[in-house]
């Protein structure tokens, strides 16, 4: 693709992916590279602009991460964020000191609106700060263009060289004008035109896959999740019947999910799909197993065995499709290691299946972009907007040993919970919600008779990035309806509890 490009140099900040996503959301393509990328690599990308991320280090530390000094001589606009601004100042002759008072959280800020970076933005606003050091002397040619009560230099610019820095974080939602500031950098300073669109990505991908594959065979492991579903449909658009998808149904999916996968991909898209009903096989392997990590390992290994058996029936395939997405690439360190990480995306399949090359059509996309591509391709919203679901499925939402009875109980209860959340119009407000069958039984009374049945936990969270999460404040009347339906419609559950723990200290999943 020949899209205009912004490079994000990663100095270890927690928001590096968020910065890249914000740039993409502004219809500008961007890539994340390590801070120590060579100047030749940077030049080869021909970027319209460069963004330095924040980071946990101090520029005063001799071992602090620094970029190639030549990057400032390329004549390309640069925006330094937090550590990125301090680094720019430090490398160009300014000075940085430790602040007497650390700034963390939302603070008031005053912008110099004559700066191109803050053009069209109200002079007084708020921003999100997270720093211990600050710039106290500016490099030659720079001027201050923002300040806060405790940070006299909250933003700097060298208009002639198009070098800009902000001490705050424009990429987070807690900086109300952050997107406007980033847009000013992208469009007014870098001169981007906004040519990153999903429709053009799809067209380019189809042509590229078609050219690469020719008349060869392609194989895809289809789970019914967002990434594998979108990857499969995109590849099918390119090569049609040359693609075969294998859907290993381990019997641990949510209610009706396996049938929906078959209905959508076989009937709607006319994809050559092999559904392997392997519930008995997986449950047999899980007998007596209570440790969640052992469950995961057993299911992962058995999945590979089943897939391998089915793949051998097809014969030699030339290409294996994987749903690797851009965060996988970034987290693996960007570069050769990215391929190694991607191999584990479908449980290590490339180590077992005879193929020549991997196709990763979504490798450059973030999850929200994958969903947009899915919508453009006509995949039903129920699949495209599907919530995160663990690979081992309901096995890690049954606490303790997994049996068919327990899975069936949980599947029915979980379906009611999800159905009532959707009926209440909360399905897009709550980022993830599900039921957990605890290993605990308790005494109850139903129809004047004593019961001794399972306790079911409900979990629902709101989150921006799934790194931290808050429990969802579901209205009591909705919870009451869910509880009444489950105890009346699902056998062997006589008590419902609602998990009101944040992450941290808890994780979102129970196992």
UniProtKB/Swiss-Prot annotation:
InterPro entries: Class_I_gatase-like (IPR029062), GATASE (IPR017926), GMP_synth_C (IPR001674), GMP_synth_GATase (IPR004739), GMP_synthase (IPR022955), GMPS_ATP_PPase_dom (IPR025777), NAD/GMP_synthase (IPR022310), Rossmann-like_a/b/a_fold (IPR014729). Residues 5-195 form the Glutamine amidotransferase type-1 domain. It catalyses: XMP + L-glutamine + ATP + H2O = GMP + L-glutamate + AMP + diphosphate + 2 H(+). GO terms for molecular function: ATP binding; GMP synthase activity. PANTHER family: GMP SYNTHASE [GLUTAMINE-HYDROLYZING], GMP SYNTHASE-RELATED. This is GMP synthase [glutamine-hydrolyzing]. Its EC number is 6.3.5.2. It is an enzyme of class 6 (ligase).
